[in-house]
């Protein structure tokens, strides 16, 4: 992937940044693509860095992701909740599956979506093979994970657990307005200058 470079003029001359480093200076983190261990480590490092710099200022996390590995996503969520800096989440494009959990776990009152963003919630996906005992262990683990995800969604949205169970039984797509009405985000971001 080609990463754009930004040139900044300073008193000491020009300085070139990759676009993500330049955004990080403004406390902006881009969570885009599949959620996996590598991405989670990068996002967590950025969260910790920004929190260490100034834990009184907001961090802005822009999310455009189809979701991914639950343990990786939960590591991001746990870090968001561990640091002192408020984390504002903004869905751009798609916040699906694990990415919808990260979106909903943003600071209350600071969870947003752009007007044409899509949010998708569903039950965890998984599979198992091997001996019957191993399959049973895997099935029990995915049921525990489903319960945890449903409880997080209920807490963040204000929906009762039965509604969450019903709505995550299959893929449940939402527009930005539907996600706001559901309680997963607080508002829809629009350009105030237009």
UniProtKB/Swiss-Prot annotation:
The active site is at 97 (nucleophile), 122. It catalyses: Hydrolysis of proteins to small peptides in the presence of ATP and magnesium. alpha-casein is the usual test substrate. In the absence of ATP, only oligopeptides shorter than five residues are hydrolyzed (such as succinyl-Leu-Tyr-|-NHMec, and Leu-Tyr-Leu-|-Tyr-Trp, in which cleavage of the -Tyr-|-Leu- and -Tyr-|-Trp bonds also occurs). One of its GO terms (biological process) is protein quality control for misfolded or incompletely synthesized proteins. GO terms for molecular function: ATP-dependent peptidase activity; ATPase binding; serine-type endopeptidase activity. GO terms for cellular component: cytoplasm; endopeptidase Clp complex. Its main location: cytoplasm. It is found in: Cytoplasm. It comes from the Bacteria. Pfam families: CLP_protease. Its EC number is 3.4.21.92. Keywords: Cytoplasm, Hydrolase, Protease, Serine protease. Coiled coil: none annotated. Cleaves peptides in various proteins in a process that requires ATP hydrolysis. Has a chymotrypsin-like activity. Plays a major role in the degradation of misfolded proteins. PANTHER family: ATP-DEPENDENT CLP PROTEASE PROTEOLYTIC SUBUNIT (PTHR10381:SF70). Belongs to the peptidase S14 family. Fourteen ClpP subunits assemble into 2 heptameric rings which stack back to back to give a disk-like structure with a central cavity, resembling the structure of eukaryotic proteasomes. HAMAP family: ClpP. This is ATP-dependent Clp protease proteolytic subunit. It comes from Lactobacillus delbrueckii subsp. bulgaricus (strain ATCC BAA-365 / Lb-18).
């Amino acid at each position: 992937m080609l990463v754009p470079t930004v040139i900044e003029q300073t008193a000491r001359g020009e300085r070139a940044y990759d676009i993500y480093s330049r955004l990080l200076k403004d406390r902006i983190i881009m969570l885009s693509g599949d959620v996996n261990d590598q991405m989670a480590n990068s996002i967590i490092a950025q969260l910790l860095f920004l929190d260490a710099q100034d834990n009184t200022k907001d961090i802005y996390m822009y999310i455009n992701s189809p979701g991914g590995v639950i343990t990786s996503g939960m590591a991001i969520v746990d870090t968001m909740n561990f640091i002192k800096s408020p984390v504002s989440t903004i869905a751009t494009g798609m916040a699906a599956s694990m990415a919808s959990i990260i979106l909903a776990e943003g600071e209350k009152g600071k969870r947003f979506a752009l007007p044409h963003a899509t949010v998708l919630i569903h039950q965890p996906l998984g599979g198992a093979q091997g001996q019957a005992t191993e399959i049973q262990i895997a099935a029990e683990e995915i049921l525990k994970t489903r319960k945890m995800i449903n409880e997080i969604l209920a807490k963040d949205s204000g929906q009762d657990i039965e509604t969450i169970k019903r709505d995550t039984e299959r893929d449940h797509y939402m527009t930005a307005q539907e996600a706001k009405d559901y309680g997963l985000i607080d508002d829809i971001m629009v350009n105030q200058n237009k």
